[in-house]
Design a protein with these regions (language model features):
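Zinc-dependent deaminase
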Residues: 1-20, 84, 93-159
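Helix-adjacent hinge/juxtasegments
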Residues: 62-95, 99
Length: 159
């Protein structure tokens, strides 16, 4: 069960996804929160610039390895609008980050894209737990799925 604090951070991640969409990018956003509850870093998708690795979860992993101790990384939580892709899951694991809370799952995104006739991503959409065994993961969160789906629909011209 997610706390109201968890939900506040998760809503912020979805707000960042909307900011990405408004900037012409794919709608994904993420927030890194310390074990004490302090927001350490947040970002949104930036792949529209031409680098397909500019995912917010990957940015969090890179940022955290140079600014946060291993113990603090393990105690932190990453809140994200969508479940990590395999690239971001691997970066999360290698960085030693802790818990992940996501609003919508990769399986949901794949289903929506299939429904809309959008070609699949070039990388298999594996669940985070298959990439980072033993990681604490919570999601999807039903109360935010409709909003995330609407953002994805707008991006893919289906709204």
């Amino acid at each position: 069960m997610l706390s109201e604090t968890d939900m506040r951070h998760l809503r912020r991640a979805v707000d960042l996804a909307e900011e990405a969409l408004e900037a012409g990018d794919e709608p994904f956003g993420s927030v890194l929160v310390s074990g004490e509850g302090t927001v350490l870093f947040e970002d949104r998708n930036r792949v529209a610039g031409g680098d397909p690795t500019q995912h917010p979860e990957f940015a969090i992993a890179r940022w955290s390895t140079t600014r946060v101790s291993p113990g603090e990384r393990a105690a932190a939580t990453v809140y994200t609008s969508g479940e990590h892709c395999p690239m971001c899951s691997a970066a999360h694991g290698w960085a030693g980050l802790g818990r992940i809370v996501y609003a919508s799952s990769s399986a949901q995104l794949v289903s929506w894209l299939e429904e809309w006739g959008v070609p699949p991503a070039p990388v298999r959409p594996l669940p985070v737990g298959e990439i980072v065994p033993g990681i604490a993961v919570e999601g999807p969160v039903d109360s935010l799925v409709t909003r995330v789906r609407a953002l994805q629909a707008r991006f893919h011209g289906r709204s």
